[in-house]
Each structure stands twice: as structure tokens, then as C-alpha cells.
């Protein structure tokens, strides 16, 4: 069978593969703990459920406009005003099948083959693959100081004649790092100066800790006209725990949104009207659930960090937000894929290899589950990796024996 060059170059989502493996083990009755997932466990907002049910009861579940229904656009406009102090028109907004699709369609709208997309390391696993799908080239920018916090110089040294767009994801998946206000200001000004598109992936912007506040990219923009090349991405998946609803959006100049709408109209058409109604319910409804989730995640983060700090040799930077911890386990195994496979095979703990995010020797651990799962998972990992651990471990009535050194 002959496949296209692009198809042969694309790898599947590692998190989805891990989800499948974990599900198969659970079906067999194995006591799997999943620290690889990227979805909160809190309940979906009741306002979202009621809005969906109300529309379903009308029996009018039809095609939706390719760029989203007017009522959802109105809610997104209000959201943008509230959190970014920026008023935009409906023509500046597109609703997509999740923030992932919004980013993908934005890249398709602006990239030509062989042009370059720059993003700081560590990066979300989909950015390089999205660039490939556009026939473009992903260019990772590793901070010179080895931290998770880029400086403008780290981006500048990667800029070339083929650079078309920079993607910034803060708070960051997988590190949880919230980039400094100075860096956001610098990157906005630099991209304006160089006439480069800037995609701000703000999907986690309300899930931040320690009293920090979301950073508004528009605050530093000199050009807020229809010539602006800022593309703002967000969605309901993370902050409202609505991962299965697949509603995200982009805010950008009218020309970009028009191009994105044309592309999306030939790919998926508009998102399901039922799911758009759910998003409206979440955006317009009671917001206390977001703060409740944020507080829970901050507490879970603190517990995970305390447990990881008991690992001798493991290096961990305290996340500023999201629901991920990105820890350096290279003292035990430099090959993160090998380490991740070892942990699921030996102690049934699912993690995501750091190599998928551009940093070998690291593991991404999610702390959005129950505290009992978090603590037990880290204890299992420590037992498997620490050579000073006892020879036996009991998981329920099951006895595990170390048969490795």
C-alpha cells in the first residue's frame, strides 16, 4: 500500500495510545493508575448539560455554520472582553472542534510548504505534527539556561527567512510553566516588529496557582487593528472539564478568520450544534466550578511535588499551572520511552515520555486525578525505581516481586 509522504511522517498521539493501553489493562482487571491523561475529573457544569438537553428536546439538531452559531460567538466575544479587555466582532471569531482543530486550521490558513513554525521546548506533542501536516517545518527553541522559561533571545536565535509563525503555550503543557510577563511582552513586540504571526495557545490560562494572574497578550500589542497577526486560541475542554465536547475557538483578524472558515467548511463543517449549546451554557453559566477545579489542582500539585521530592536524584520544577508535572528521571533511565514502558509493565502506572515533548529523560505526570491515585502511583514508581526499596510490594491482595536490578 502506498501512503503519502505526509502520512508516513506523522506519528499517532502518544497520549491517545497510552489511553488505549491503559483501557485494555483495566478491562483485564489490572489495577492501572493513569498519570498520562490530559483531562480533569471534575463534573461537567450543570449549565452545559441543561443547555444541551434543552436544545436536544427541540428535535432541531441540524447543520451549524462553519464558523459557529451566533450565540456561541457572542459568548466568546464576552469571554474575550472579560479576560482580555478586548472587544472583537463576530467576524473575528471562529468556533472549532476543540482548540486543537482551531490551531490546526489557523496553521493551514497561514503556512506555505517549507515555512517554519517556532515553539519553545518543552512543547505540546501536536505542534510538530501539525507543522508537518501543512508541509511546513517545526523548529523547537530550547531555552539556553536549560529551564522551562524561555527568554526572547531563545526565540530570536531560531528566527530565519522562512519563519512564519511562533506558537506560545502558557501555562505550558507539559511543564506547567507560566511564562513571565516580560517574555510575553517581548514576544508580542518582536513578532509585530518582524511581521510574524503569533499563536497564543491559552487553553490553560485560568488554571494557574500561587495567586498568579493570567497574562493578557493584547496588553502589549501596539497594533490591535485588522492588521494584527495575533491568533488567540482557547476552549472549554480544560477549564470546564469538557474534554469530550470538543469545542474550541480562535480570535484573530477578519481575513484570517475568513480563511479558517473556508478551510473548516471543507473539513468538518461547523461543530455539532448540541456541543456549541453546551459551550454556551458553560461560558454563560455559573463559573464557580472553574475556581473549584483550580483549587483542587493546586492542592493535588502540592501533594505530587512533595511525593516526588522524596525520590533521590529526581529533579522537579514546581508547576505554575495546568495539571501536569514534568520531572527529570534521567538519573534512573535516560531513555524516557523505555522508562515509561517499564513503569506500566512493572507497576501499572501510565506516564508520558518526555521525548514526545522534546526533552529526553523526563516524564510527564498528570495530577488531575484523585489524591489516592496520585500518591499510590508515585509510591509504586519509587518502589520500582529506587534500588533501596523492599523486594515486595502489595497492590490490594496482589504481591509484586522485584525481579530486576
PLM segments and residue spans:
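Short beta-strand to alpha-helix junction loop
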Residues: 67-68
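Glycine-rich loop-to-alpha-helix module at the N-terminal edge of alpha/beta enzyme cores
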Residues: 35, 58-62, 75-78, 82
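PLP-dependent class I/II
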Residues: 3, 7, 11-13, 18, ...
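Short, surface-exposed loop/turn segments at secondary-structure junctions
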Residues: 63-64, 291
